[in-house]
Amino acid sequence: MDIENDIRNRRIIRNISNLLDDDILCDVIITIGDGEEIKAHKTILAAGSTYFKTMFTTPMIARDLVTRVNLQMFDKDAVKNIVQYLYNRHISSMNVIDVLKCADYLLIDDLVADCESYIKDYINHDTCIYMYHKLYEMVHIPIVKYIKRMLMSNIPTLITTDAFKKTVFEILFDIISTNDNVYLYREGYKVTILLKWLEYNHITEEQLLCILSCIDIQNLDKKSRLLLYSNKTINMYPSCIQFLLDNKQNRNIIPRQLCLACHDTNYNVCNPCILVYNINTMEYSVISTIPNHIINYASAIVDNEIIIAGGYNFNNPSLNKVYKINIENKIHVELPPMIKNRCRFSLAVIDDTIYAIGGQNGTNVERTIECYTLGDDKWKMLPDMPIALSSYGMCVLDQYIYIIGGRTQHIDYTSVHTVNSIDMEEDTNISNKVIRYDTVNNIWETLPNFWTGTINPGVVSHKDDIYVVCDIKDEKNVKTCIFRYNTNTYNGWELVTTTESRLSALHTILHDNTIMMLHCYESYMLQDTFNVYTREWNHMCHQHSNSYIMHNILPIY
């Protein structure tokens, strides 16, 4: 019986392969390098690739009789090999790095695992820098972490090799800025690595400033400090000299201003704009408008540039466009679009990688998560959330993205809500779940449930604690409550304090040791702060000329 099954299986594989060879019933055309085309079958490709499965089941594409897919950005031989692989054919020879990159993009997990196994057998002390050069941008893949561990553990000897002398700046920055406790170098040794690399490489002023910011100047030993201060390259750049002088004493890093993403209700609720707000004077200035009159988008700050993603306008139920806005020169740049259309979601930022999580897509609520690293030409899908969520609260702490509450079913497309954290009526579609995403190991974890279901709570992290700010309705009135969860003890949620609610959307940010809440109400800017140490509230009110509905607040350092 086993022999018969084996013969039958081989016959099925041969029949499928013949379809590819004979161009029979093909319904997808893949364009590769030099404009060459490969004809294939959606069903076969979707069976082995999550990327193709998602693409071909999208309603607009599913209606196409023949779908065209552009993979010209990858090595054409690698794409050919992958198509052969999906038709269950043996790959006789391959450039494993090119195949791995393409297989990872197409979400072909089995082939990625095969490539990782091949690389693991090949990698050694002499080749680890070369391989890391080729793959360091793919840090989400386990084999890349394995190569990095090998590199980091051997760096004392590797810095004398020709391979290290030719290392690109991005690898140097990755080595010195690592926050892996196992390979966390003492500050003096970071200086040794930097100065050795500077002997053989050119570096710009901006790049050198980035590297220096990864070194704790205050805790340098005397010898390392003298070597750093006397280096010719460092002394070429005034900003680097000033940085060293400014960091002789410890300085707290706190936002100097806030970026406010708002909607100007004096004109039109669909007229979004960006303000820069001075925390101390409570003064603000309009610096930009947001493209396409979108609402319920997600926003974030990366290197003090504003990222605007998704949302919707009344011509489109949801969008996938992404924009970057420079705060200084106000220039708008369109970035690669997200794979999924999203609104009522959040963007998390860890280092220079942006994560788009859940949200509403048409009449569906998404479980999907995708990420984009600045400088790349595409977004990539990551493991789905345990549940579908939109309008949740979110914050980042270390390598984790924390998600609190949210909606589990879609809501109709309406204008921006002035009150978006209060459940005034019973709603069974509001979640009290708390989950977090481990961006290093690419897994979701479930944490103790929140006290109650909540929509768009304010969430911030302070040291090892997560604070949630939300409005809760009791029998008499509505209170603004602050809850705390310690990430070390896992003891559940503690109610820290309550105060009278302002009945407006709670936009929350951590400023120094205080939780700051900003509200725009009619012609007033309201600023409430709560000190996490003294547990004291401070309420301030400032009148301004225009009327805004605030959508998000972001720190500018």
From Swiss-Prot:
Principal location: host cell
InterPro entries: BACK, BTB/POZ_dom, Kelch-typ_b-propeller, Kelch_1, SKP1/BTB/POZ_sf
PROSITE patterns for the chain: BTB
Name assigned to this protein: Kelch repeat and BTB domain-containing protein 2
Keywords: Host cytoplasm, Host-virus interaction, Kelch repeat, Modulation of host E3 ubiquitin ligases by virus, Modulation of host ubiquitin pathway by virus, Repeat, Ubl conjugation pathway
The keyword Repeat belongs to this UniProt entry's keyword annotation: yes
GO cellular component terms given for this protein: host cell cytoplasm
BACK domain residues: 133-223
Highest taxon of the lineage: Viruses
Free-text note on domains in this protein's UniProt record: The BTB domain is responsible for the interaction with CUL3 while the Kelch repeat domains supposely serve to recruit the cellular substrates.
Originating species: Cowpox virus (strain GRI-90 / Grishak)
Residues in BTB domain copies: 26-95
Localization of this protein: Host cytoplasm
CDD domains, alphabetized: BTB_POZ_ZBTB_KLHL-like
